[in-house]
Amino acid sequence: MISKRKKKSDTKVYALGQHIRMSAHKARRVIDQIRGRSYEETLMILELMPYRACYPIFKLVYSAAANASHNMGFNETSLVVSKAEVNEGTTVKKFKPRARGRSYPIKRPTCHITIVLEDTTVYDEYVISHDTYSSGGLWDKK
């Protein structure tokens, strides 16, 4: 049996962006592309994608990496986006004046974006442990 041994207990660093003025559905379209990728690959993807949601997500990933290097001392090349989620925020409601004294409501949705980066150097060391309770294989039993 192969098990993983962790060196440090805290390997995750996060950045949270709240009340970003964009639809959660449009931000999820970009977030789904970067989930599980390395930090450098994520920055490259976000710079080349043509969506408006890329810039605030780029700033959050960059901020999370700065938190990892400054607060925890992690190397930026070994960071991976382990968790990236988008939640709906409050809706900003306005009224648009129209003809003959009428008004139409305008709803501007907001979203909350959470980016979690994890250090992968912790999982470099593997430990092989043998199960002491098994007598061998399936064919040893009578």
Curated annotation (Swiss-Prot):
The cellular location(s) given in this protein's UniProt record come to: Plastid, Chloroplast
Any matching Pfam family:
Ribosomal_L22
Provide a GO CC annotation, any one: large ribosomal subunit
Q: Does the keyword Glycosyltransferase apply?
A: no
* GO biological process assignments: translation
Q: Which SUPFAM superfamilies match?
A: Ribosomal protein L22
Which PROSITE patterns does UniProt cross-reference here? RIBOSOMAL_L22 (PS00464)
GO MF terms listed in the record are:
rRNA binding; structural constituent of ribosome
The organism's superkingdom is given as Eukaryota
Keyword line: Chloroplast, Plastid, Ribonucleoprotein, Ribosomal protein, RNA-binding, rRNA-binding
Per the record, the major location class is plastid
Q: Which InterPro entries match?
A: Ribosomal_uL22, Ribosomal_uL22_bac/chlpt-type, Ribosomal_uL22_bac/org-type, Ribosomal_uL22_CS, Ribosomal_uL22_sf
The family line of this record is: Belongs to the universal ribosomal protein uL22 family.
Assembly and interaction partners: Part of the 50S ribosomal subunit.
UniProt xrefs under PANTHER family: CHLOROPLAST 50S RIBOSOMAL PROTEIN L22-RELATED, LARGE RIBOSOMAL SUBUNIT PROTEIN UL22M
Q: Matching HAMAP family, A to Z?
A: Ribosomal_uL22_B (MF_01331_B)
UniProt function note: This protein binds specifically to 23S rRNA. The globular domain of the protein is located near the polypeptide exit tunnel on the outside of the subunit, while an extended beta-hairpin is found that lines the wall of the exit tunnel in the center of the 70S ribosome.
Q: What is this protein called?
A: Large ribosomal subunit protein uL22c
Species in which this protein is naturally found:
Carica papaya
Name of the gene = rpl22
